[in-house]
């Protein structure tokens, strides 16, 4: 048997409930948040508001269902969530609405797995401004905090 949460809530607003579930249940627990930055004021992705300066007309009063793009979590937020959930003993992990292959790879790698898609992880050591590789010219690295 598996008990858990799927959909509606993003990582930030799902985690408190998962902690409570884990305290009282010893069975398998699942966690599949939506890939959106829900918060205390907007705990589900159905009522997220875009407060980042969108001035265009949208057909709804909230970003759901067709204007959620700027509300998405990044890979590091999903990775942090997956690692924290895994450390709580939650081992049925994933991402619901808004998921993509990169995020699923991030979930897997955050709990120590190497999956076939791991070969596509970016190699930042060769990035033209932020790389550490000896072949990245110093004058390019100097642009990192100015570009």
Annotate each PLM feature.
Residues 1-147:
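Domain-level signal for soluble alpha/beta catalytic cores
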């Amino acid at each position: 048997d598996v008990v858990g949460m799927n959909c509606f809530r993003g990582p930030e607003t799902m985690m408190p409930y998962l902690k409570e579930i884990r305290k009282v249940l010893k069975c398998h627990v699942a966690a599949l948040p939506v890939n959106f930055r829900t918060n205390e004021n907007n705990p589900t992705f159905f009522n997220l508001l875009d407060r980042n300066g969108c001035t265009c007309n949208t057909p709804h009063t909230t970003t759901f269902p067709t204007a959620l793009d700027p509300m998405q979590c990044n890979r590091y937020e999903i990775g942090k969530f997956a690692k924290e959930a895994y450390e709580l003993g939650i081992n049925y992990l994933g991402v619901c609405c808004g998921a993509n292959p990169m995020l699923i790879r991030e979930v897997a790698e955050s709990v120590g797995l190497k999956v076939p898609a791991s070969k596509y992880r970016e190699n930042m050591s060769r990035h033209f401004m932020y790389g550490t590789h000896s072949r990245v010219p110093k004058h390019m690295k100097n642009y990192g905090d100015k570009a």
